[in-house]
Amino acid sequence: MFHRRGAVRPFLSALCLPTCLAFAQDGSVRFEDFSVEPSWLSYRSHLLPNPLPITRQSFGWRDTLPTNGSRGEIGGWIQRSLTPAWYAKVIPARTLNDKLSASGKFSVTRDDSTSGVLVGWFHETSRGWRTPNSLVFRLDGNGGKYWVFYEYGTRHWFTGGGGCFEGDRYQTTPTQPFKADGTTHEWTLTYEPSGAGGNGLMTFILDGKAYPQALAAEHRRDGAEFNRFGICNLQATGSGMEVHFHELTLDSQPLDLSRDPGWEARGNNTEFPERQMRPFHDFGWRPTGKAGGKPGEIGGIIWRDEKPACYATGVETLSLGANLFASGKIAFHGAGSDSGVYLGWFDAASKTNKTTADYHEPQRNLLAILLEGPSRVGHYFRAAYSTRVGHGVIQDSGPILYPDGRSHTWSLHYKSTSGEITVQLDEERTTMVVSPEHRQEGATFDRFGLFNLQAGGHFVDIAIDDLTFTARAAGK
């Protein structure tokens, strides 16, 4: 069973230098710059669906006659994909300090399972799920029926929102979903910066019922910027939806759809074989230089999935009785919500023989960095460990690593005498202690590398370079 605890405090990255030098001098560490492909173990890290499914986008302006009798609408077939697609009006930059309002009507005539469309304000650089710099409502298809959500994302991936149903979760609500039968629904989406005590208030109205959503104070301070208004696909793997929008207004002004409005079209009329889809991992060695700036690194797309996957190198058998150290560079390029990955030491047999989800049976024999966190925050860069019997701890919090593609330095240090684990990201570090009881239970490790969380979820896209790590116990 995993528990959560720990502390976070700022720290100067230069202070890890004595530790680095000490480990280097005793010969217990190994260095990899990945300039050539290493002979690491790849276990289910490169999976390919056969045949490759086809992603199809076919949406935009349509010279059709909606039920109101006025010609022109936007919409069509929109499919979930990690590849972004949108049809949107370019607008002057707006922020969370501006009033926003839009309204219209929509109808869904078909939806396959796991489909999704976002409608509202976003930015041309908005990527991923959940979507930063966005203030939208979402149509979420579930195979002939769909749910409606309203949500926002700030510039640093803070999110908030809710659903148009009773309770907190659509999986347990007594509210019935909408049917994809072409029924027309009316909607209004507004944002008032002075609402909710000055934190900002988002209000979504669907068929006359209002759903207010106050922004968290921290989210308002983080801010967001929008320069597009329109429709875009939900950027996660899945299927498609046929949906149509008409009688649109923006800032209380009607949008003329009687003729082609010439809105910006990106990836909205295309077909391609889909390589990036759950749960088909694609990580290992890469000739790219995203993390270290020079060709050669490891990483790629790693999914949360109930089945095991890893890319790692063998090390001499290590335990909680040995001092452990690792450091390197990391670049985080993309992620969905409910996603994560481990980087550190683990036991190959414990990992590859485990076929149950982590919430039924925790992973055993690991000491690692866990890049993961709640969707309201994003991704913490924090320590985690588990003993040979599966008892362990995940830190409550840690430095937040944003999926913005920037390169960062990091380190992980475990002291066997005190049980202290220190994780550092740039100039911020976190510490926690392996309890005496857990140290007595013990853990063994014979691999170092990347390995997945075995629980259903979404993906992370990372790159690791200039890697130093303990490969044998000191003094051997």
Where are these regions (language model features)?
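Bacterial N-terminal signal peptides
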Residues: 9-22
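Secretory/extracellular carbohydrate-interaction modules
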Residues: 69-163, 299-387
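Flexible glycan-contacting loops in extracellular carbohydrate-active proteins
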Residues: 214-244, 433-463
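Extracellular glycan-recognition surfaces and repeat-rich motifs
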Residues: 41-77, 264-302, 306
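N-terminal secretory signal peptides that target proteins for export/translocation
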Residues: 1-8
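Extracellular carbohydrate-recognition regions
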Residues: 25-54, 244-281, 476
